[in-house]
Amino acid sequence: MAKSKFERTKPHVNIGTIGHVDHGKTSLTAAITKFFGEFKAYDQIDAAPEERARGITISTAHVEYETPNRHYAHVDCPGHADYVKNMITGAAQMDGAILVVSAADGPMPQTREHILLARQVGVPAIVVFLNKCDQVDDAELLELVELEVRELLSKYDFPGDEVPIIKGSALAALEDSSKELGEDAVRSLMAAVDDYIPTPERPIDQPFLMPIEDVFSISGRGTVVTGRVERGIVKVGEEVEIVGIKATAKTTVTGVEMFRKLLDQGQAGDNIGALIRGVGREDVERGQVLCKPGSVKPHTKFKAEAYILTKDEGGRHTPFFTNYRPQFYFRTTDVTGVVTLPEGTEMVMPGDNVAMDVTLIVPIAMEEKLRFAIREGGRTVGAGIVSSIIE
């Protein structure tokens, strides 16, 4: 049978389940596929395959389903460490998250940690599924748990008062034991997700940016920079900026080439060579970016959330302290930086995730949510994301 063509008629949204261990994330994922996709049983999702992202092995399960309005790619991770790694590396991008909280237990340590991580890595919106409501007879207790969840969300700068909270039971949905708590709740949940989680702006609609991978000099024509366009569109004749490492410079794109053919523009996803006017081969280097003027600024100091690899994952064997000086790999290049740990954190052990301040020795084109790897002599020892820029 011929493989069916992916119909891109509906907007596509990436989503994931987050929350404390055993609160029902995987059961809920299975229940959603039962009504909106090709049904995947709990054990099919739970046996998540391992993937590598930025040198780190992560187990994640991917399912897809659709509502009348949207197509969803949904990620579910079996273990807590996988969530931490997934959110920090961005292995599976999340445009929104479904926070699963057991009504029988209320918010637990990982509930808090996942909300904090969602805030740190810039997940735009959260919808809550209060699971296992069939185990709670007391309506007042349900209200109390809901209140606790809203307070916790507000504490981490999510709009706790507005976040939709759906009460139900993933198990009831899977076993058809209660339509109200089962199927109806799952359908209400997806209606809330459709409505509350914003459709992400497509990369092509964002301001142009291309990380520079290589620089060539072509006799009689000038300097060509190559790379994969990360977002936006660049047209021949447009003014662009070269940002990072050195002082920001302006130039004009006088030609765009792809697969040795001349084009009038390059767009998100294209691997292109851009001919730039009046710039010498020695004025540009790998690690800089070509971008729409004024869209990105160079920075050296930032706050980051990072995951440090364990020894078994090929990471460090020993802890590190304030003033640790590894390389930070941004887009296409390594830059040395100095780490300052937050007050009260004496040291960071392999396997920890940590909030830290970093000062780079040269500026890099940077914005919030930019991901990086932490390396020592070319070997990955951690992964991180810029949570806010200091200067």
Curated annotation (Swiss-Prot):
Domain tr-type G residues, every copy: 10-201
Alphabetical UniProt keywords: Cytoplasm, Elongation factor, GTP-binding, Hydrolase, Magnesium, Metal-binding, Nucleotide-binding, Protein biosynthesis
Pfam families registered for this protein in UniProt: GTP_EFTU, GTP_EFTU_D2, GTP_EFTU_D3
Region of interest: G4: 131-134
Region feature G2, mapped onto this chain: 55-59
This protein's GO CC annotations: cytosol
This protein's record includes keyword Protein biosynthesis: yes
Matching CDD domains: EF_Tu, EFTU_II, EFTU_III
EC number: 3.6.5.3
GO molecular function: GTP binding; GTPase activity; guanosine tetraphosphate binding; translation elongation factor activity
Annotated spans, G1: 19-26
UniProt region (G3), positions on chain: 76-79
Subunit structure: Monomer.
Summary of the function given for this chain in its UniProt record: GTP hydrolase that promotes the GTP-dependent binding of aminoacyl-tRNA to the A-site of ribosomes during protein biosynthesis.
Official protein name in the record: Elongation factor Tu
Originating species: Brucella anthropi (strain ATCC 49188 / DSM 6882 / CCUG 24695 / JCM 21032 / LMG 3331 / NBRC 15819 / NCTC 12168 / Alc 37)
Gene that this polypeptide is encoded by: tuf1
